[in-house]
Amino acid sequence: MFAFSLLTALMISSEPVPLGWGGSDFVQYYAAQQLILEGKNPYDRQAAEALQIQLGRSGGVAMFAPPWSLLPSRPLVRLRIEEATRLNIVMNGLLLVLITAAWQAMFFPDRLSLLPLLLASLLLWYPSLAVLGMGQLSLWPLAGFTGWLYARQQGWNLAGAVLLVLLVI
């Protein structure tokens, strides 16, 4: 956890880079949040696309995600796009680690020695790299479903609450 925190601090404090890895999808959510802060409609296609281009995207794309899907990007909107993109990568990376650990605990509880191998394989598995590289929010519903399964397996009474909170996102 210390190494993860140190990596996060280094990523945030390093020099900004143009919109690139981790920002192609995330910039849509970030631009939508910016429009909301300005009191504008995040689904105004012209305004959203113009802002996305201004933020570094080569071309704008329409925002089709439902409003509640913007919640994970909400805390990042006050940061510069470069910092917000980096933190989004860190948040998605942390979600991947937690999801992997939960699935490993559910299906291989007697083989904890597999966890380092599973975590290392995340860096080589294309879907993991794609989610991190685009800045998608698709890990949030997976985290909700995984949390619900894990909570049910543990016999927690609030398993449905975990699912509800994260699936709404």
Summary of predicted features, one role per range:
Residues 103-124, 142, 159:
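Transmembrane-helix signature of polytopic, membrane-embedded enzymes
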Residues 96, 137-146, 168:
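Hydrophobic core segments of transmembrane alpha-helices in multi-pass, intramembrane catalytic enzymes
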Residues 2-107:
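TM-lumen/periplasm interface segments of multi-pass membrane proteins
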Residues 138, 145-159:
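Membrane-interface transmembrane helices that cradle and orient dolichyl/undecaprenyl
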Residues 158-169:
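Membrane-interface alpha helices of multi-pass inner-membrane proteins
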